[in-house]
Amino acid sequence: MVIIRSFFITGTDTDVGKTVVTSLLTRFLIDMGVNAFPYKPVQSGATTNGARMIPSDAQMYQLVRPEFDVTDFNTYLLEKPCSPHLAADLANITLDRTVITKQVHQLEEAHDAVLIEGAGGLYVPLTNDGYCYIDFMEELNVPTILVSALRVGTINHTVLSIEAMKARNLPIAGIIFNQLQIGNPVIEQSNVETIRKLTDTPILGFVPYSPDIHTVLADDKLRRHLYKDWDKRRFKELIHSD
């Protein structure tokens, strides 16, 4: 029996591939028989098309859930490409955490799994009163998937992120590594093994580099190739019960 459950997708930094991983994870779970829905509560850096604001990250979501409108994946759309608290201030908008939480629960009622994507890393402010994404994660108390980029510096960034979550007693589902460019496989493997030893955290999978990720996400065969080696057993433990 599938549990109705949310997962929080966070990253070690901005531009590490959270949206790519969230999109892939959506289809990965759907392939496992789980009705998964990607959701980014606050989208900053939205573009405008006439009077309509277009969320760039949600456009990627729509490639894997094309039956939904691009505006269905966010609660707040903000134009400035900066931290949500500042983008909201610049737009004279107040971000209401209770509205976001209510939206999460409504989505949970409609889907088996809701994949909640944060912005930047753990300590990016969500509101200007000092409430950060890690505070929101603590409030939701759902399993967290950490996206880490396979690049120089990833050991420090990943270990610090894991330690910050452990300090808050947040449930950690595991780490997904995203290859942003073709790198040295010896260095990449060493980084992964070092992180595994230092954090004792499950490695859920890897996303190999793709020069045209939008084309890949829109194609079933190409998309499945990116997550073919993900840890299905671990995910089954997280989303199923007797």
UniProtKB/Swiss-Prot annotation:
Binding locations of ATP: 15-20, 117-120, 178-179, 208-210
Classification via Gene3D superfamilies: P-loop containing nucleotide triphosphate hydrolases
Biological process (GO), any one: biotin biosynthetic process
Enzyme nomenclature, EC number: 6.3.3.3
Role, per record: Catalyzes a mechanistically unusual reaction, the ATP-dependent insertion of CO2 between the N7 and N8 nitrogen atoms of 7,8-diaminopelargonic acid (DAPA, also called 7,8-diammoniononanoate) to form a ureido ring.
Residues annotated as binding substrate: S44
Name of the protein this chain belongs to: ATP-dependent dethiobiotin synthetase BioD
Active site annotation, chain numbering: K40
SUPFAM superfamilies on file: P-loop containing nucleoside triphosphate hydrolases
Gene that this sequence comes from: bioD
Primary site of residence: cytoplasm
Annotated residues for binding of Mg(2+): T19, E117
Record-linked PANTHER family: ATP-DEPENDENT DETHIOBIOTIN SYNTHETASE BIOD 2 (PTHR43210:SF2), DETHIOBIOTIN SYNTHETASE (PTHR43210)
Source organism phylogeny: Bacteria, Bacillati, Bacillota, Bacilli, Bacillales
Biological source species: Halalkalibacterium halodurans (strain ATCC BAA-125 / DSM 18197 / FERM 7344 / JCM 9153 / C-125)
Cofactor(s) needed for function: Mg(2+)
InterPro entries: DTB_synth_BioD (IPR004472), P-loop_NTPase (IPR027417)
Subunit structure: Homodimer.
Matches recorded under Pfam families: AAA_26 (PF13500)
Any GO molecular function: ATP binding
Localization, UniProt: Cytoplasm
